[in-house]
A protein has these predicted regions:
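A beta-strand signature from Gram-negative outer-membrane beta-barrel systems
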Residues: 55-97
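Gram-negative outer-membrane beta-barrel transporters
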Residues: 467-469, 489-582, 680
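Transmembrane beta-barrel wall of Gram-negative outer-membrane proteins
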Residues: 102-133, 138-175, 215, 220-231, ...
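Extracytoplasmic beta-strand/coil segments of soluble accessory domains associated
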Residues: 2-39, 55, 61
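Face-selective signature of the C-terminal outer-membrane beta-barrel domain
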Residues: 215-381, 409, 413, 419, ...
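Membrane-embedded beta-barrel scaffold of Gram-negative outer-membrane proteins
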Residues: 227, 231-239, 407-409, 415-423, ...
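C-terminal beta-signal and adjacent terminal beta-strands/loops
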Residues: 570-586, 612-683
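Short acidic/polar hinge/loop motifs at secondary-structure boundaries
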Residues: 2, 39-67, 86, 183
Length: 683
């Protein structure tokens, strides 16, 4: 993904399993992702869980990443960034293919692809079947992913109708606790994983074998493209996604009352025991999108469209096993201890006009209205010490999101552009649950972009300046809830500003050099923390979490007579785990204070991919190769959390601290040097 301003994370350490991307420091829940123009983000969390769409990249023909506010045509919730994926076009000729990969940490992938080609000049079908598995770099961080992709289409002179279905089934062992450096040192390994850990009566450590996430997601899309006249087109789509799954975990020392195993009046309400619980989700997401596109093929293009989506999801928890049942009068199988329903409806309409005033100079205006109605009701999994929190909520939002821009093609080599966009985004389910009894406000973003591009036969370059001014931006605090999800809260006024550079040079046919870099300044203007005496303290202007000031990417590509080599490097600057600006907290211990880091240190990694493509009788094409990841075995962390306390020291200065506790910062480790071989056959 060779795009400026991007960083990635991986729970398992080697890229297979739970992973995510951040764009310009924007967390994944603020990145709008679509497939064929249809929303992929989970409607409640706004996240995309890529493990639920295993090997989907093998069925993607084109991926457009738009930094900043995306256009209305790229989805209802375009906000901090947009990723629009177009699945593969159905080819006119039949084919079959097999892709095989295997490498470090017992990682392997098997993919079978086929296409029928055009049948009777109108019909065609295409498909993919995939299996991915890995034990992960982190201990027990195994992943098993099974998926398919199928599409069939009718192709007429003016009409194209396609039906697409794809799914994903995953089983992933938990690795979201992110241990502290101190825990890694005690364990004698940076691969240490505390998820599933428990002790028997003799004090021996064990790991629960089913401490895993299980999920099945099924997608259906029906797409219509109709040419009405040479200048007018109609596009429409229906979609439905079914999701069901759960995660199972061993919990030590939990109160019987917390899980409704005894009544509130019971003398054993606070009695603790070990148990196994499941948290389940059963949801349906469906809707429709449509648009009319007009192009007079001279100087005017216009689009009018909209969409409607509904999400209906049940969240509930089951107790599967209890170690000590002597105080439980009647333990039912699959005892349900909470049940909450979320119902979210989202509608939007938009209009976009692009007009070329004179040759080379054009402008566009994009206006969108969006309405959201979000309801939640029933007890949640949040226990307040007395009972499960009942979360009855209904919120309605109405957003007007205007955008406008100018583009000037100076000549065949030079062009400039400028744009402005106003965007809004509602809080996620996690935002509401993690901030119960707090008045949450929708986010607002004013995004200004200004850029220049140069394009010639052998060299291209571009520079983009951006200023993203937020009001009530939800920023990650650095803290996690008990299932490893990051907690966010409104930041008041904040901003992200920077410059992005891109360049590519290909002096000869067999060599290409690509590079990009981002310099940025990301700040919260008035970040407050709660001191240990309960008072709020304003830290003033502070750096935003997970937002490096500098990112650099570089690729050298050699391609000669079937042999291809690509040397890829990335440098990522320091990232703070909180919004306080503190680089460390002080663990106050009897034998002296100990400073514990609260940052992701800068890192530089290099990957090398080698491949050779050749032909054999009976086989159209064979490609064999090997990818060497983290070539110089850099030891770095790709993600983390921190949750110290804050107080004023003897000089009245606010400091981050804990009382003899080095466990309040944890890290996701990345794998050192590792290898993945790959072999592909095309028939």
């Amino acid at each position: 993904m060779f795009t400026p301003s991007i960083t990635t994370t991986s729970d398992a350490g080697a890229g297979i399993g739970y992973s995510s991307i951040r764009v310009r420091g924007t967390d994944p829940s603020r990145i709008n992702i679509t497939a064929n123009g249809i929303p992929v983000n989970d409607a409640e969390s706004s996240q995309v869980f890529w493990t639920n769409m295993g090997d989907f990249a093998s069925s993607v023909e084109n991926m457009q990443i738009q930094r900043g506010v995306g256009t209305s045509t790229n989805g209802a919730g375009a906000f901090g960034a947009t990723i629009n994926m177009q699945t593969e076009k159905i080819g006119t000729k039949p084919y079959a293919g097999v892709d095989l990969s295997a490498g470090s940490y017992a990682s392997h992938k098997e993919t079978f692809r086929f296409g029928t080609g055009l049948i009777k000049n109108h019909w065609a079908f295409q498909g993919r079947l995939s299996h991915i598995a890995s034990d992960g770099y982190v201990d027990r961080a195994s992943t098993r992913l099974d998926s398919y992709f199928l599409q069939g289409g009718y192709f007429g002179e003016n009409t194209v109708v396609k039906f697409i279905t794809f799914n994903g089934k995953e089983k992933t062992y938990h690795a979201w606790n992110y241990p502290s450096v101190y825990e890694m040192e005690l364990a004698g390994s940076r691969r240490y994983n505390s998820c599933g850990e428990y002790y028997d009566e003799a004090g021996n450590v064990h790991y629960y074998k089913d401490q895993s996430d299980f999920y099945h997601q099924q997608h259906y899309q029906l797409l219509l493209n109709q040419i009405i006249t040479p200048t007018l087109k109609f596009n429409a789509a229906l979609h439905y996604t079914k999701g069901f799954g759960y995660y199972e975990e061993y919990k030590s020392g939990r109160k019987l009352g917390e899980y409704g195993l005894v009544g509130a009046e019971s003398a054993y309400f606070k009695t603790k025991t070990d148990l196994v619980r499941q948290k389940l989700m059963d949801n349906d997401f469906y809707g429709a999108v449509a648009s009319f596109d007009y192009d007079n093929r001279q100087n005017l293009r216009a689009t009018v469209g909209g969409g409607w989506n509904r999400y209906d999801g049940d969240h509930y928890g089951l107790v599967k096993w209890v170690k000590n049942t002597e105080h439980i009068a009647d333990l039912q199988p699959n005892h349900r201890y909470y049940s909450n329903n979320g119902d979210k409806r989202d509608a939007n309409i938009y209009g976009k006009v692009s007009y070329e005033f004179v040759k080379g100079l054009s402008a566009y205006v994009d206006l969108q209205y969006r309405h959201i109605n979000y309801k939640m009701d029933g007890p949640t999994d949040d226990f307040n010490g007395t009972t499960q929190q009942v979360f009855d909520l209904e919120q309605k939002y109405d957003f007007f999101n205007p955008k406008a821009g100018l583009f000037y093609q100076i000549n065949r080599n030079h062009s400039v552009y400028a744009s402005y966009a106003l965007a809004h985004k509602e809080p996620t389910r996690n935002d509401f649950e993690d901030n119960i009894n707090t008045h949450l406000r929708a986010e607002q973003l004013n995004d200004w972009e200004l850029g220049y591009k140069y394009q010639s036969e052998k060299f291209s370059a571009g520079v983009n300046f951006y200023y993203m001014a937020y009001r009530d931006q939800f920023v990650l605090t650095g803290e996690q809830n008990e299932i490893g999800e990051f907690i966010a809260r409104n930041a008041g006024e904040s901003y992200r500003r920077g410059v992005e550079l891109q360049a590519a040079w290909s002096p000869v046919k067999w060599f290409r050099w690509d590079a990009n870099a981002t310099w940025s300044h990301n700040r919260a203007k008035d970040w407050t923390v709660t001191l240990d005496d309960g008072t709020a303290y304003n830290l003033g202007d502070t750096p935003l979490s997970f937002s490096p000031d500098f990112i650099f990417n570089n690729i050298f590509t050699f391609d000669y007579r079937g042999f291809r080599a690509a040397l890829t490097s990335q440098y990522v600057g320091k990232q703070r785990l909180s919004n306080t600006g503190f680089d460390y907290y002080v663990s106050e211990e009897e034998n002296g204070n100990h400073n514990v880091s609260m940052v992701l240190k800068r890192h530089f990694i290099t990957n090398l991919d080698l491949a050779y493509t050749f032909r054999m009788k009976g086989v159209k094409r064979i490609t064999a190769g090997c990818t060497f990841y983290n070539l110089f075995s850099a030891k770095y962390f790709n993600n983390g959390w921190t949750a110290p306390s804050y107080k004023k020291d003897g000089n009245g200065k606010v400091v981050a601290y804990t009382s003899s506790d080095r466990y309040e910062t944890g890290y996701a480790v990345s794998a050192p040097f590792n290898v993945m071989g790959h072999l592909s056959f095309e028939f």
